[in-house]
Amino acid sequence: MEENISAAKTTYSADGNEVLFFSIDDTIYGIEIKYVNEIIQIEQITIVPKIPDHIKGVINIRGKVVPVISVRKRFGIEEIPYDDRTCIIVLEFDDGNQVGIIVDRVQEVINVNPSDISNTPDSKNVNANRYIKSLINLESGIRLLIDCYKLINDDGGAA
């Protein structure tokens, strides 16, 4: 099953503050939609020897080899078995590089008001915190906005 959100990209507001929210355990994180190319169901990942532990391997997307990162491993959270809601969010950067990130579930896309975004507290001692770009204060609670570049590139990442 494949969910391509490219059609939704044409309806974004001019301010570009669309955020895709996903969950790992009970915590909801966000990624700026401008980096999201597509969302696919978890599929067979080819393991590559001698790569960092958080990189699960590679997948083939329409003939392109795409590295896949476990967000759980990256954040130092215990891995769990994949289920029917486990997804790979395929990110694409300005240079054309693509990287997939494995998440427990995709939640929703929301247009976030810039006034609801604030800097993170300076608590970089927790592994996952260094990947948090900012906090988003929504009616449903505070959400954590991920810094995609740090998530992918920190300590010899995949991109």
Predicted features, each with a name:
Residues 1-159:
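An acidic, low-aromatic, low-complexity terminal/linker signal
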